[in-house]
Amino acid sequence: MNNSLISKYIPLNTIVHNLDPRAKIFFVIWYLVDVFIAYNVLEFLILILMLLAIVILSKTSPAFLINSVKAISILILFTSLIHLVFNKKGTVLYEVLGWKIYSGALLGIALITVRFILVVAIMVVFMATTSPTEITSAIEKSLGFLQKVGVPISTFALVLSISLRFIPTILEETNRIINAQVSRGSDFNEGSLAQKIRKFIPILIPLFIATLKRADELATAMEVRGYSTTGVRSKYKVLKYNKLDYLSYILIIVITILIIL
């Protein structure tokens, strides 16, 4: 099973890793906004160069990014076909067996492809450089003011942290079950789509049981340690901004202004 899109945190000592997670979340959100408001070649070139700089600074493996993009190749192909069939904007460039291909369709395909690649790449880098604990701490710290009006931010942060932790665990468990089935002679690559789906059904029951077992073990461990979302808890690592964090805020805001103008 391809889990490139759901990357694990890779602990390294880089500039990107050492940024405050709140700054990284803000940067990623605004980068995604810039990706979808960008339209011309210069704007996308700025975003691509920024992404390349982040990849280099974070020491993220290019091969890992390529594998992540491959994971959404079917989605890109599907959206491209939709543009070819339904996008009638622009002039007719080609005509094959009565099927007209418009310039607007090709432009739409180019835009959606670049946007998909940039979105996946920035999310993969973010997940590889920010641990689940840092993400939840950043959310809890940023939205802590809502706790005063009765919104259970601590509970939400706990649920998010456990969810992020369980995703790679479930994927590893799925791979283990699939390997066990393959060793017994099962072949998940042969047959029609319906047959492939039926072959995955026997995986669901042991996966469901294993997931419940892991969840029960986690709940027991938290209960034994007296964990509570209502009490005041100290932090092992206190979030604190530094100069690089403020610089990242300024950088993404400047880039956004350049793209809008």
What are the residue ranges of the model-derived segments?
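Alpha-helical transmembrane segments and their helix-start/interface "positive-inside/aromatic belt" motifs
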Residues: K24, P62-S73, D245-S248
